[in-house]
A protein has these predicted regions:
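Non-catalytic cell-wall polysaccharide-engagement segments
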Residues: 62-185
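Short, solvent-exposed loop/turn and secondary-structure capping segments
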Residues: 52-62
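Glycine-rich, acidic and aromatic/proline-enriched surface loops and short helix-turn segments
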Residues: 1, 45-49, 115-122
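Short, functionally critical alpha-helical segments immediately adjacent to catalytic or ligand/cofactor-binding
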Residues: 26, 30-51
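Poly-acidic low-complexity segments
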Residues: 1-4, 35, 70
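N-terminal export signals and maturation junctions of secreted/periplasmic proteins
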Residues: 1-22
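Soluble non-cytosolic domains of exported or imported proteins
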Residues: 15-23, 33-37, 100-108
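Flexible domain-boundary/linker segments
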Residues: 45-46, 59, 130-131
Length: 185
């Protein structure tokens, strides 16, 4: 639903601007130090629900959170209440002033969310999908995870691989594989 799509948003000065999601992801990558492929794949994992559908967390129309967007579902902790995870994420996106919050338009949500991902995960050692799910780094070991879904590293890696298309064979790959000591043989 975001491929070759544009959107109109109102910036903090009240000026309306039009841009594409592609340009927004490139801006987000530049400002966060995170790959645009990773950012787009993360958003696809988190909020794209089908060929034309997206989660209500990016609609700007959720009751009580009108005009608030969260493309990465940051803070969308699991909840037993219907719509609770979306409400938790939108509440997070609406409070505080770090990472361009409150995320009152798509641009701020995508770029600010990328800055959050870079500052709190990718650029501080949790730079693989595995480490974002299973934190075995020296910082906050076992506690600082990005995703609740046990299958997220696998499914998101498939989306990232698809994003690179056929160009993967010419790329230099660097593998980061945690090695565990004291494991049974």
């Amino acid at each position: 639903p975001m491929y070759r799509a544009s959107y109109v948003y109102t910036d903090d000065t009240g000026k309306e601007s039009s841009t594409t999601y592609s340009k927004t992801f490139m801006d987000a990558a530049s400002l966060s130090g995170v790959s645009p492929y990773h950012l787009a794949s993360r958003v696809k994992q988190e909020v794209v629900t089908g060929p034309t559908g997206m989660s209500s967390s990016v609609s700007g129309t959720v009751a009580g959170y009108e005009g608030i967007y969260n493309f990465y579902n940051i803070g969308a902790n699991n909840s037993t209440k219907a719509g609770g995870a979306v409400a938790n994420g939108l509440s997070w996106a609406n409070k505080d002033t770090t990472y361009m919050r409150p995320w009152t338009n798509q641009y701020k949500a995508i770029v600010g969310g990328a800055q959050y991902l870079g500052s709190n995960y990718i650029n501080v050692g949790q730079n693989t999908l595995y480490l974002q799910k299973f934190n075995v780094t020296a910082n906050n070991t076992y506690n600082h995870q990005y995703m609740a879904n046990i299958e997220a590293p696998w499914s998101e890696s498939q989306k990232t691989a698809d994003a690179y298309g056929t160009d993967k064979s010419d790329m230099r790959l660097v593998f980061s594989i945690p090695v565990y000591s004291g494991m049974p043989s």
